Amino acid sequence: MSQRLTDVLQRLAATIEARKGGDPSVSYTAKLLNDPALAAKKLGEEAVETVIAAVAQGSDALAAESADLLYHWLALMAASGVSLDAVAEKLEAREGTSGIAEKASRA
């Protein structure tokens, strides 16, 4: 992953966090943060749109939908109170483990 993407995602996550407590009537992000179920629904919609872009719309559409997907994922994590460090911890625990073995360990 490029440092550029890391930096952009960190800024976006900080912006989302700053919207907590904001007015949902004027901030889409605040609206998502106030309603984790809505944030989850929007993430699902963006996931489907990302898949469609990947198989039928080309690389520019895939990049645009991926940006929407990442934004909505970050919003859902914030709305649900799950830190990105918690996600990093899970990913680190899986490093070096075969995907099949790792998945079996969660069953």
UniProtKB/Swiss-Prot annotation:
Stored InterPro entries: HisE, PRib-ATP_PPHydrolase-like
- GO CC annotations? cytoplasm
What's a single GO MF annotation on this record? ATP binding
**Pathway in which this enzyme or protein is active:** Amino-acid biosynthesis; L-histidine biosynthesis; L-histidine from 5-phospho-alpha-D-ribose 1-diphosphate: step 2/9
- Is DNA repair included in the keywords of this UniProt record? no
Keywords in alphabetical order, please.
Amino-acid biosynthesis, ATP-binding, Cytoplasm, Histidine biosynthesis, Hydrolase, Nucleotide-binding
For this protein, what is the EC number?
3.6.1.31
The set of disulfide-linked cysteines is none
Kindly list the biological process annotations in GO that this record carries: L-histidine biosynthetic process
Question: Where does it localize?
Answer: Cytoplasm
Give the matching Gene3D superfamilies: MazG-like (1.10.287.1080)
- Give yes or no: UniProt keyword S-adenosyl-L-methionine: no
Q: Which domain of life is it from?
A: Bacteria
Which reaction(s) does its UniProt entry say it catalyses? 1-(5-phospho-beta-D-ribosyl)-ATP + H2O = 1-(5-phospho-beta-D-ribosyl)-5'-AMP + diphosphate + H(+)
The family line of this record is: Belongs to the PRA-PH family.
What HAMAP family does this protein's entry cite? Answer: HisE
Q: What is this protein called?
A: Phosphoribosyl-ATP pyrophosphatase
Q: Native species of this protein?
A: Caulobacter vibrioides (strain NA1000 / CB15N) (Caulobacter crescentus)
Gene expressing this chain: hisE
